[in-house]
Amino acid sequence: KIDGKVFMWSRKGKVIDVPDKIKNQLKSLMNEKDCFDGELYVHGWDFQRIISAVKRKNSDTDKLQYHIYDMPEPNKTFENRFLKKDLNSLEELNIKIVKTDIVDKKNNLEALERFYVKKAYEGVMVRNRNSLYEYKNRSYDLQKVKRFEDHEFEIIGGKCGTGKESGLVIFKCITEDGVEFDVRPKGCYEDRSYMYKNLQSY
């Protein structure tokens, strides 16, 4: 927050147009020069739907949420710097503080990861509670825990990707239970372009 105005940047420094509803709520929440580390997110939405709601105002835009992971402050550990503001003053809350759980054993971490995966999250992040905030760098004190499983599914269709994936295939598959989902196949640009052009062969 600078001079009473709220700004948002991507990790690469690109300015993001903050949705009005979130901007107004952040104004009420933040003090001058406060800085948050977070992302625009709605649980259950895919990345393309979120990007679409940010870039072009539509019926989804006011449903976007801003999830806060951290509050960068030099020379303060995560435990001492993390946001402890009262959010009850906001009537229609689109600002979410990401829950932090303390674990001291590997077994506890694995159980917690399974818990969140069952709730349809990709995985969990592990952070050193005594770590300092690092700007622009991927920190050793902040690691992603993400489980990978291989399964085979029937391909029932596909579509062309958009943006950077324009011309590249995105397959539609189906599980044994009849649940349909989109998946991006492994392969380079040329491989996925060939797959899209020959979609009827799959």
Where are these regions (language model features)?
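Nucleic-acid 5′ end/cap handling module spanning
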Residues: 1-14, 56, 74, 91-202
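Covalent nucleotidyltransferase
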Residues: 1-96
